[in-house]
């Protein structure tokens, strides 16, 4: 990125916002929530502090938070994990960004709060038109929220496409293994794990990054890295064996 710091600061928060995995690390523990909220809004707008606080309260109410004044006058350590996450999301959406990056937004929450946060994100996406990019290890969350899914392994995209294509007809061995490892209440099958160990990211292999854990790997997999290739109108996979008749689906 060659953009100057001042230009980047104008974009961050205003055009692009980020929700961190740990809401506790996002909020300053020695400053009141309202002070942090107002500072964020005033930095990017011409609103007065009073107007900024009113806007903060309105956003918190939209996220179904009660006693907004008490929340704004309180500190982060006085809030539950779910409330802190909602405050973080509210701060990220305060300026109605065009893009919201959410890093594991539900991983630190219990199931009930997870569902509430997910529904709030989807509702805000519909109402505000904000594009949302979610980073998660939860394939079911991706299946529920996403329009398109990109599966990454060791920092590289190994499969990307429309949700229905990736979830219903996965082509990469890693994607298939991930889906096979999802517990299902309607099936009495033994859970499948992924054999082997992760590669050292400091010493990447010359071939496929998943070859040492893939039960379908052949010689070329260890010698040459595969490139993303189209297997559908909106479906790309990085696998040398993709499309070969002898390739079996590990979910079976």
Regions found by a protein language model. Name each.
Residues 69-72, 160-252:
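Short catalytic/signature loops enriched in Gly
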Residues 101, 105, 109-189:
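P-loop NTP-binding/switch modules centered on Walker-like glycine-rich loops
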Residues 1-17, 35, 43, 165-170, ...:
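ABC ATPase NBD coupling module
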Residues 75-79, 83:
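Conserved ABC ATPase signature
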Residues 94-98:
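A short, proline-enriched helix->beta-strand linker immediately N-terminal to the Walker B motif
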Residues 2-8, 35-51, 61-66, 78, ...:
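ABC-type ATPase nucleotide-binding domains, specifically the catalytic core motifs of the NBD
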Residues 51-70, 122, 179:
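Conserved ABC ATPase "signature" region
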């Amino acid at each position: 990125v060659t953009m100057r710091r001042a230009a980047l600061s104008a974009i961050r928060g205003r055009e692009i916002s980020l929700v961190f995995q740990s809401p506790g690390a996002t909020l300053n523990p020695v400053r009141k929530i309202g002070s942090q909220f107002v500072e964020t809004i005033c930095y990017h707008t011409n609103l007065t502090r009073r107007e900024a606080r009113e806007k903060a309260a309105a956003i918190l109410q939209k996220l179904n938070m009660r006693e907004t004044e008490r929340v704004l006058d309180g500190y982060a350590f006085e809030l539950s994990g779910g409330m802190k996450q909602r405050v973080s999301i509210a701060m990220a959406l305060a300026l109605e960004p065009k893009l919201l990056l959410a890093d594991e937004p539900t991983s630190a929450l219990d199931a009930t709060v997870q569902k509430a946060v997910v529904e709030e994100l989807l509702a805000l996406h519909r109402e505000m038109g904000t594009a949302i990019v979610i980073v998660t290890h939860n394939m079911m969350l991706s299946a529920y929220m996403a329009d398109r899914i990109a599966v990454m392994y060791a920092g590289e995209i190994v499969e990307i496409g429309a949700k229905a294509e990736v979830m219903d007809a996965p082509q990469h061995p890693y994607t298939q293994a991930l889906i096979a490892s999802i517990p299902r209440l309607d099936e009495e099958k033994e859970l499948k794990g992924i054999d082997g160990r992760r590669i050292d990211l400091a010493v990447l292999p010359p071939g496929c990054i998943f070859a040492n854990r893939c039960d379908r790997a052949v010689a070329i997999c260890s010698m040459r890295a595969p490139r993303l290739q189209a297997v559908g109108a909106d479906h790309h996979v990085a696998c040398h064996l993709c499309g070969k008749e002898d390739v079996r689906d590990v979910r079976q």
